[in-house]
Each structure stands twice: as C-alpha cells, then as structure tokens.
C-alpha cells in the first residue's frame, strides 16, 4: 500500500507517549517536500501559513478523527476552515485504537465505580483495569458519578441517546472513507466478544437486550463455532466447555486506523481546507472571534471548535468553562503471530479487557483501561499482563515495536461526548469526550456538529449530547 503514514516503524512507536508522537519521522509526517500526491497535499495544506494573519470562518482545534471529520464536513458545507494541531493529524488516540467501528455498544462504558468494583481492582491489578493508587484516589468522586450514570434509568437514557448514532456510524464511516479513497482499509465481518466464563457472559445481558430493542444483529457462538469462524484462536486451550462468543455482525473494522485519519485529512486539504501547526493553549478570545499564533503566522476565525480529546479541558479551563472530563489511558503493541496463526476480525476478551486486531503491521494488542495521570510515564506491566492473557488465545511472536504505544481517552461520567455550542462562551463549539468511541463516532458527531455550526438541520437530534447537560 502507498499511504506513507501506515509504515508504523518501531522507532516511531517507541517515541509515542500519551497519545502524541514525538519527533515524528519525515515520512510519517506526511512526506512534506515530496512530489507525489501525499507531498503535494502536505505542501498545499501548509502553504498559506507564510502570510502574517489569515482569517477563516471556523478553526477546528484537534486533528484526531473527531476534529478531522468535523473540519471536512464543515468544508463540504461551504465554510472556510482551518484545522489546527501541534503535530501530524491522527497521531493521538485515533492512531492507536483497536480499529473497530461498532454497531453495538448500548450500555455505558465499563469503568469501575461501585465500592465492590473499586475494592476488586484495588487488590487485583488486571489487564482490564489497572491503576496508579494516587490517581485512583483522586478520581473517586468522578468514579462514583460514573457509577451512578450506570444505574437502570441512566443506562436506559444512554442507550436511547446512543442508539441512533450506532445505527448510522458504520455507513457514515464508509461514506467518508470512500470519498477519501480510504475504503481499502475497511473490512466487513464484524467483531467477536469472547467470554471465558458463564458469569462474564451473563453480565453482558443488558447489552444484548438493548441490541434486540434497537435492531443490532448478533450471533451467539459456542466454542466449536468460534473455532470455525476464527481457526487461528487456541480454542482447545481456553476452557472450551464454558467459552462463548457474541459475533456482532454489522460492525466493521480497519487494518490501519492512522492511515484512515491521514486520508481524511488529506481530502480536507484537497478540498480547500487549511492545516496549521500550533499550540492550542495559546488560543485567545478576541472581539469578533478567536486568535491563535501558529508556527508561521496568526490564525483568526469567527468560531472555534474544541476537539482536543483528553487535552480539551486544558483549553476550556483557561477560558472559564469546565467539564467533568477524566482520562483513561490505553496501550498497544504489534506482534508477528507464530505458526502462521491469523485473525480475520478483531476479538475482544470481555473478561480481561484486551482486543486483538489484525492490522497491516501484524496483530495489534490493545489493552483495557489504565487509571493514571495523562502525562505520567508508561507502565510496561500493563501491556505485559495483557500479552500474557492474550497468549491463551493466539500464539504471539516477537514484538514489532521497540516500546508500547500509549494513548489517552477522554471520558465523561455519562459515557457520552459533548457535541454542541458552549452554554457560556459565544462562538465556541465542543466535540470531545468520546471515551473508547472516538473512532466509531468521530465521523457522525463531526457531521452533526458541522451541520449545527452551518445552521443546517442535523441528520439526527443532537440534544442528548449537548453541553447543557453539565450546566448546574
């Protein structure tokens, strides 16, 4: 394949900390200076930075899939748009996720919050949830709030807000990908939720119930059926008597999430959008709009969109607005499977929280949640424990990276993102807090926000995602 960004070299991954790639190699930064389509796109996207002040209708801060999709939808609605990040588009959590576009996901994300759950992780670190003790203590109020949002009434509300998004998420992804010539990275075939015990399977009954309510198709598989669907899994060594799986048939996945975001960004540039490198912490609210100093000049826009993921709160606090945003970290590592073993779709171990995804660069192992400070050093034990559990299922060979990738997921206590206008600051818009759903929901929430900014009727009712729900 010819996309420069997909060449995930060990040195690049070793330098990736907290979801940002440091000192990115020239090829991975878009081939600047090249004469092919990638180099031309980069030059065009950066060319207008030479003027001292440039004015736009909207500046989008954050170039992960959420920000890139928002910017492209705004551009296609006829607005003059600047996309801004401090590094290459798609270099954060959008780069390192499991690459699944979920049709399922009707219950709030499984972050521990009850006293029983907290005691469980306190005395037993796992690949599903690991923690730094000081961070765990600091997050206790947030975790209790999250636990309350997982009650029956709150969970029912969550399902009804998220169900319309799930219903269109796959198609929105595919439409955007086709227009960006990135559909070659997508594969059908769904993904597997693997359960090693009956009790683990029973705990997920609410997910299956809401799937039936909202028409999301799935298949229940026993051990022998799992082995037929994924012969590369070591079913015989995985307590086959109790092994079950749910095959979410309408989900899809990608072989290279970073390349998908890169392709969408390049399409934004080809269609007349502008890209700037700048530090969003320098954002200033001036009369009539927003001002930000970039590497090669000043960017001014009438409206600003905060799509900075786990860094969104840093900017908003300086502007006098605050949201209960917590950060959950996650890791990935690529391996070359032994003995010719392979997977044809992502597989998630529901008991241990890791995902095995076939990618262009081998099998990607992504971990569960780590409760630690966003910018704290990586904890190598997290990926080591996940690998130990994963090798029960597939024989993993040597790592294809020097060190694990580490990313930060922005989480709100009700497990829903904020998408809409600031309730207190004029001409400020938000699109962040997607937790583990950024890759799935980025294209659709980007469209919904763009339609609101442009004064169009949104495809779906966005009121359930409004920032107003956090106004006291």
Where are these regions (language model features)?
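N-terminal Rossmann-fold NAD(P) dinucleotide-binding loop
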Residues: 67-68
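Active-site substrate-recognition segment that forms the wall
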Residues: 100-101, 105, 109-148, 285, ...
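C-terminal catalytic lobe of FAD-dependent flavoproteins
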Residues: 218, 351, 392-472
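Helical element adjacent to the flavin cofactor pocket in flavoenzyme catalytic cores
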Residues: 202, 206-214, 241-302
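Glycine-rich FAD pyrophosphate-binding loop
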Residues: 76-95
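Dinucleotide-binding Rossmann-like beta1-alpha1 core, especially the glycine-rich loop
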Residues: 98-224
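Short beta-strand to alpha-helix junction loop
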Residues: 157-170, 193-203, 246-266, 377-382, ...
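Beta1/beta-strand and adjacent pyrophosphate-binding region of the FAD-binding site
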Residues: 53-64
